[in-house]
Structure formats: C-alpha cells, structure tokens
Amino acid sequence: MVVRVVMFSAIFLAAANVPAAAETRDDGGRLGIGQGANSCWAWTRSHEAKAATQGLYTQWVAGFVSGLNWNTDDPDILTEMDFDGLMAWVDNYCKANPLAKVTTGAAMLVQELRERAQRK
C-alpha cells in the first residue's frame, strides 16, 4: 500500500511539472498555441528562475519570428539582430507588460523589426 501511495505521489508530482498546452487568440480571432499563449509574467518568472521552461519560451519566440520572416515578401527582418538580441527585446517587453501574452510581445518585436528593415 505504501508503495502505491509513493508511486502515485511521484507520478502526480511529475505530471504537475509538465507544462500544459496553451492557446490564445489575437484580435482578429486567429488561434495561437504553445508557450506564446502564456503571460509575460510567466516568461519573466521562468527566465529569472532559469527554469526548464525557459528554453520552451525562447524557442517558441524564435520559431514565431522566423516563421513570420520566412512567410513574407517584405525585407528580411532578422539580418540586423541575433538570437540574444531578440530574447533581450522580449525580456524587456515582458518586464514592462507582465499581463500581456508572450505572443503579443513576439508580435510587437516583429513589428519593430519590420519598421527597422523598411527604414533601410
């Protein structure tokens, strides 16, 4: 009986630490899924704690920005900023806007990068 309780507790604790699938919708109703649907507060907390989810967030943002960059005829928005610069931008955005979604921060980053690329 004790073994069952210990096993159940271990499984429960392990499952509780697995990030849940998240989703969000933009103003136009388009669905977004993954870590980007979480709050900027969660992003900041994850990065400050150097939690395992930190990599999930950063890779989600990298994929979001890269995908939007590849799926356009606009100028390449990633020629002037490296990975660390992108993450620093989102860090700053999320610290200033803890209630916003990570998706919103990533979209604002893309908007900023597009504006910079068009000025060149």
Q: What are the language-model segments listed below?
A:
Residues 20-24:
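Boundary at the C-terminal end of the N-terminal hydrophobic targeting segment
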Residues 1-5:
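Positively charged n-region of N-terminal signal peptides that target proteins for export
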Residues 98-120:
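C-terminal partner/receptor-binding element of secreted or periplasmic proteins
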Residues 26-92:
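Short N-proximal segments of mature Sec-exported proteins
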Residues 15-18, 120:
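Intrinsically disordered, low-complexity linkers and terminal tails enriched in Pro/Gly
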Residues 6-16:
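Bacterial N-terminal signal peptides
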